[in-house]
């Protein structure tokens, strides 16, 4: 069996599609989320916060690949930095950073 894949932002707009595709392909999927969730549909959920670094280390442990889909209006560089550090310490072999283009808010 292939190594575990961790998806950050796996409950968001982009991430939930990534999780679905990986799960359908038979991958061992773990999701890092700020809110606790029960495991379901072959997906393990772990609670953590990329901004504070809390819970990242246990989430990346055992993941050979990390797909980073988490994004927000601010603080993305620090969040990515926290994830990269934890991934490096855990020996993750691959880190994929996905994002989506945001449309400017028409009222701003």
Residue ranges and their predicted role:
Residues 41-49:
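Active-site regions of enzymes building and remodeling cell-envelope glycoconjugates
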Residues 11, 36, 102:
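Short, glycine/serine-rich, charged loops/turns that create anion-binding
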Residues 31-37, 49-50:
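N-terminal Rossmann-fold cofactor-binding loop
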Residues 2-27, 33:
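N-terminal Rossmann NAD(P)H-binding glycine-rich loop of SDR-like oxidoreductase domains
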Residues 26-28, 42, 92:
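A generic structural signal for alpha->beta connector loops
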Residues 16-18, 41, 77-78, 106-107:
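Short glycine-/acidic-enriched loop or helix-start segments at secondary-structure transitions
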Residues 44, 53, 61-104:
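NAD(P)-cofactor binding segment of oxidoreductase domains
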């Amino acid at each position: 069996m292939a190594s575990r894949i961790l998806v950050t932002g796996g409950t968001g707009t982009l991430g939930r599609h990534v999780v679905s595709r990986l799960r359908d392909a038979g991958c061992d999927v773990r999701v890092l989320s700020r809110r606790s969730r029960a495991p379901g549909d072959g997906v393990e959920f772990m609670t953590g916060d990329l901004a504070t670094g809390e819970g990242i280390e246990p989430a990346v442990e055992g993941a050979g690949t990390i797909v980073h889909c988490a994004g927000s209006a601010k603080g993305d560089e620090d969040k990515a930095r926290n994830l990269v550090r934890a991934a490096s310490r855990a020996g993750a072999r691959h880190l994929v950073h996905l994002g989506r283009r945001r449309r400017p808010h028409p009222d701003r």
